[in-house]
Design a protein with these regions (language model features):
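Mid-domain Rossmann-like dinucleotide-binding core that forms the NAD(H)/NADP(H) cofactor-binding site
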Residues: 31-108
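Residues in the short beta-alpha loop(s) of Rossmann-like NAD(P)-binding domains
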Residues: 88, 156, 182
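Glycine-rich cofactor phosphate-binding loops and adjacent beta1-alpha1 units
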Residues: 51, 55, 93, 97-175, ...
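Glycine/charged-rich beta-loop-alpha catalytic/anionic-binding loops adjacent to active sites
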Residues: 22-33, 57, 122, 172-173, ...
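Glycine-rich phosphate/pyrophosphate-binding beta-alpha loops
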Residues: 175, 181-182
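C-terminal hydrophobic helical "lid"/dimerization subdomain
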Residues: 138-142, 184-234
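Glycine-rich phosphate/adenylate-binding loop and adjacent beta-alpha elements
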Residues: 1-23
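Structural detector of well-ordered beta-strand residues that form the stable sheet scaffold
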Residues: 24, 60, 83, 149-151, ...
Length: 234
């Protein structure tokens, strides 16, 4: 797999030509449907490593999509108690299957108060926002404990300004930061996580289509309830 130093758009090409020094090799038994997750896993490795999660910390992940569920798994590997904010019941169940300790629907009741109840009124030490909704980004700050860090993993769509209580950021010593894309190092670590079976990526594959059914694949992938959709050349 080519690390982050390889850029460009290759469409649905079955093969691309790159220099051998720019590749990480997977064991032969790892199928393409797993190795194709390398880039998203590397992005999440970058995110979680920046957080410096400590054993026993409360980590709250907003969003139960593919990137949110990868955050669940890596935060668990770091020894955190994981809380997931996700309105879809099926994705809540999937988050629990992948290691989430607590899941809840943020649209039901007072979400901020719920998180406080689960964390002895503190809030979460680390909050990852994996959704693109600016209103949810604002809520992420309210979930964050005193001295905690809010990570904006997702870009905003639309890219609107997010109102921020800077007084609370000051008085509660909160940190707001972002993470984007993998590095060469996190790309390598992603290959190790997948090759050694330390992350479950197969569960995140909603459906794989042969390239001859590409139109159907795009239509399937455009549905909001789907997870990962792949096109294979088998």
């Amino acid at each position: 797999m080519a690390p982050g130093c390889i850029s460009g758009f290759f469409g649905l090409a079955q093969y691309i030509a790159v220099k051998s020094k720019d590749l990480y090799k997977y064991p032969k038994e790892i199928p393409y449907t797993k190795s194709a997750f390398t880039e998203p896993v590397a992005c999440v490795v970058n995110s979680v490593e920046k957080a410096g999660i400590a054993f026993g910390q409360d980590v709250l992940i907003i969003g139960g999509g593919v990137m949110g569920l990868l955050h669940v798994q890596l935060a668990k590997l770091r020894g955190a108690r994981v809380i997931v904010s996700e309105p879809n019941e099926d994705r809540q169940e999937l988050a629990q299957k992948l290691g989430a300790n607590i899941t809840f629907d943020p649209a039901e009741g007072d979400a901020i108060e719920f998180v406080k109840q689960q964390t002895e009124e503190r809030g979460a030490e680390v909050v990852f926002n994996t959704t693109a909704n600016p209103k949810v980004a604002q809520q992420a700050l309210d979930f964050t404990a005193k001295g905690g860090t809010t990570f904006m993993f997702s870009s905003m769509h639309p890219n609107e300004l997010v109102p921020t209580d800077m007084g609370a950021v000051h008085s509660q010593e909160r940190t707001i930061t972002g993470t984007v894309s993998p590095t060469i190092t996190t790309f390598y670590r992603a290959t190790q996580l997948i090759a050694k079976g330390l992350v479950d990526v197969e569960t995140l594959l909603d459906k794989a289509f042969n390239y001859t059914d590409a139109t159907e694949a795009f239509e399937h992938g455009a549905r909001p309830e789907t997870l990962k959709t792949m096109i294979t050349f088998d």
